[in-house]
Regions:
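Conserved ATPase-coupling elements of RecA-like P-loop NTPase cores
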Residues: 86-89, 112-114
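Glycine-rich nucleotide phosphate-binding loop and flanking beta-alpha elements
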Residues: 1, 19, 83, 109, ...
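Switch II (G3) loop of P-loop NTPases
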Residues: 74-84, 244-250
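Walker A (P-loop) phosphate-binding motif
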Residues: 1-45
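Short catalytic-loop micro-motif centered on adjacent basic/acidic residues
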Residues: 12, 39, 76, 137-138, ...
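AMP-binding/adenylate-forming catalytic core of the ANL superfamily
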Residues: 248-260
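Acidic, Mg2+-coordinating active-site environments of NTP-dependent enzymes
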Residues: 5-8, 27, 32-35, 47-49, ...
Length: 260
């Protein structure tokens, strides 16, 4: 973090589920806007074909910048709550010092290092407290565990998604999505991704990108060209008329979400 993230606008994506997909969406939105972000993602976004890059301006094929030594100020990182090392039991994400942080969701996980849910909540509380007051927390407004974490103390502005009093979606025919902030219509997203979880991921990415300077309309346009991540509802073929998908979901709630 000292060598790569220092003096950069870090956008960190945390949560039990959806980190990889949301990080990929966010990196793609910024890249589509010509901001050429660096990123470190726990999967391979098909828009990039790689899981990490430093983020020099020419990394973006649509960038108009000409200085080949100029580094993008933006860096998107998948922010995991797993411990840092055997000699540092703090969660990895406390080292990233983000200016923009997404809190996708929170439930018990990593039973090998956390005794219970409250132990994970404590780490998320530490994470929330390092985000500056000129930053932004983008939080899932439907998650009671995240609400409990934020109630412990937070001095950063918060924008919620998934609730009528914040950012939310309405599904229309042909897999199109109307996007709203409160009751104000923001635009319509036409895309091929399925599921409520991906709509929530998209909202989080749009809000975070907006904080970094990308208008919502531009973010929606970018997501229309988003190709998802390998092994995230990846279509592998058809057998006897049945479409076969490959997905990385590994715990009960994630598997349930994918099946739904």
């Amino acid at each position: 973090s000292e060598n790569i993230l220092r003096n950069r606008w870090v956008l960190a994506v945390s949560g039990t589920h959806g980190k990889t997909t949301t990080s990929s969406m966010l990196a793609w939105i910024l890249d589509y806007a010509g901001m050429a972000p660096g990123f470190l993602i726990g999967g391979i976004p098909e828009n990039f074909g790689i899981s990490a890059r430093i983020g020099n301006i020419p990394d973006s094929p649509i960038s108009q910048h000409r200085n080949i030594n100029e580094r993008s100020p933006f860096f998107v990182i998948e922010a995991d709550e797993y411990d840092t090392a055997f000699f540092d039991k703090r969660s990895k994400f406390v080292h990233y010092h983000p200016r923009t942080a997404i809190l996708n969701n929170l439930e018990f996980d990593h039973a090998d290092i956390f005794a219970d849910l409250s132990a994970i909540e404590r780490q998320f509380h530490h994470f929330v407290r390092i985000i500056p007051n000129n930053g932004l927390i983008v939080s899932n407004g439907t998650d009671s565990n995240l609400k409990r974490v934020l109630a412990q103390g937070c001095w950063t502005p918060i924008e919620e998604f998934g609730v009528k009093t914040g950012w939310h979606t309405e599904v229309q025919p042909n897999n199109t999505i109307d996007i709203y902030f409160n009751e104000n219509y923001q635009g319509c997203l036409h895309w091929h991704l399925l599921g409520e979880h991906n709509r929530m991921n998209a909202l989080a990415a749009l809000i975070a990108a907006r904080h970094a300077g990308v208008p919502i309309a531009a973010g929606i346009e970018a997501l229309a060209h988003f190709k998802n991540v390998k092994r995230r509802m990846e279509e592998r073929g058809t057998v006897n008329g049945n479409t076969i998908y490959d997905d990385f979901a590994y715990n009960p709630s994630a598997i349930q979400t994918i099946i739904q």
